[in-house]
């Protein structure tokens, strides 16, 4: 089991490596597999994010799915494929940020636009392990080559390394 996310219906979603997606109903205390009810890109799931609009973002080893939990058959839509997704973070503007093996991607839920940032844009590495917002229009990003602060307003990265005081870059 790699991650959990609780939805508004008191279901605890469970990400597994190789066994797909499950949920545990906190009211009935029953487990349910939804492998046969969705079209997940991949059953190797590393991270989950539950959004207030009742969507579950499922980060897999081959991209990300967005599952509409209001749909009776849990309809799944592919957002980004062919990337290992390590982390998911949603900011206050409704942008879902994805940390992957191929950089940092921001998916705007309203416009459906996907923007990807890589080392060519200033990241120290394209392997993004974690993303966290700080409430000041910045994202903090951990990579396998240091930490970055991403300034969303001007799309700039400030990178921090061992030389700046980190214990290690990874």
Tell me the role of every PLM-derived stretch.
Residues 1-170:
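Carboxylate-rich, polar loop motifs that coordinate divalent cations or form catalytic acidic clusters
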């Amino acid at each position: 089991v790699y991650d959990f996310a609780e939805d508004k219906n008191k279901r605890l979603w469970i990400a597994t490596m190789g066994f797909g997606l499950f949920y545990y109903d906190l009211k009935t205390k029953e487990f349910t597999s939804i492998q046969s009810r969705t079209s997940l890109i991949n059953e190797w799931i590393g991270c989950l994010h539950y959004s207030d609009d009742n969507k579950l973002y499922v980060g897999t080893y081959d991209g990300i799915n967005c599952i509409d939990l209001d749909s009776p058959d849990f309809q799944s839509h592919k957002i980004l494929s062919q990337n290992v997704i390590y982390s998911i973070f949603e900011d206050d503007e409704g942008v879902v940020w994805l940390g992957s093996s191929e950089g940092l991607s921001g998916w705007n839920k309203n416009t459906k636009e996907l923007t990807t940032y890589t080392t060519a844009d200033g990241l120290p590495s394209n392997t993004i392990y974690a993303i966290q917002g700080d409430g000041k229009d910045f994202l903090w990003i951990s990579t396998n080559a240091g930490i970055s602060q991403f300034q969303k307003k001007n799309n700039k990265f400030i990178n921090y390394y061992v030389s700046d005081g980190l214990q290690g870059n990874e």
